[in-house]
């Protein structure tokens, strides 16, 4: 039994979120939550909320035992990129890319 949780449009780049996602892939949910709780990266807090949602989905919808769950699949896709302008000297302007991502976490029995 595999249960998923998704977050679409998270406010960080996919590249930065993947750094955190790669650390918890394949680990038990307890170990993954510990890693995320003590990580200093912004993506860790976002992914932790998605993982907790997936655990709650498994408990509520499937009646799964939390102690036997592991992070079976986690992936991060690029979301929309919002384009902004930053005024510069002499009438010039630079483009600023506000990147977003879609985070998907799947937990399954070991």
Curated annotation (Swiss-Prot):
Keywords: Ribonucleoprotein, Ribosomal protein, RNA-binding, rRNA-binding. It comes from Teredinibacter turnerae (strain ATCC 39867 / T7901). GO terms for cellular component: cytosolic large ribosomal subunit. GO terms for molecular function: rRNA binding; structural constituent of ribosome. This protein binds specifically to 23S rRNA; its binding is stimulated by other ribosomal proteins, e.g. L4, L17, and L20. It is important during the early stages of 50S assembly. It makes multiple contacts with different domains of the 23S rRNA in the assembled 50S subunit and ribosome. This is Large ribosomal subunit protein uL22. InterPro entries: Ribosomal_uL22, Ribosomal_uL22_bac/chlpt-type, Ribosomal_uL22_bac/org-type, Ribosomal_uL22_CS, Ribosomal_uL22_sf. Transmembrane segments: none annotated. It comes from the Bacteria. Belongs to the universal ribosomal protein uL22 family. GO terms for biological process: translation. Part of the 50S ribosomal subunit.
């Amino acid at each position: 039994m595999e249960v998923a949780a998704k977050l679409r449009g998270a406010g960080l780049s996919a590249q930065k979120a993947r750094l955190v996602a790669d650390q918890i892939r394949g680990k038990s949910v307890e170990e993954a939550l510990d890693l995320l709780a003590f990580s200093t990266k912004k993506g860790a807090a976002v992914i932790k909320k998605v993982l907790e949602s997936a655990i709650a989905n498994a408990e509520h919808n499937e009646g799964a035992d939390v102690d036997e769950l592991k992070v079976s699949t986690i992936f991060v896709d690029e979301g929309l990129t919002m384009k902004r302008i930053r005024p510069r000297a002499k009438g010039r302007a630079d483009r600023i890319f506000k990147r977003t991502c879609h985070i998907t976490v799947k937990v399954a029995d070991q």
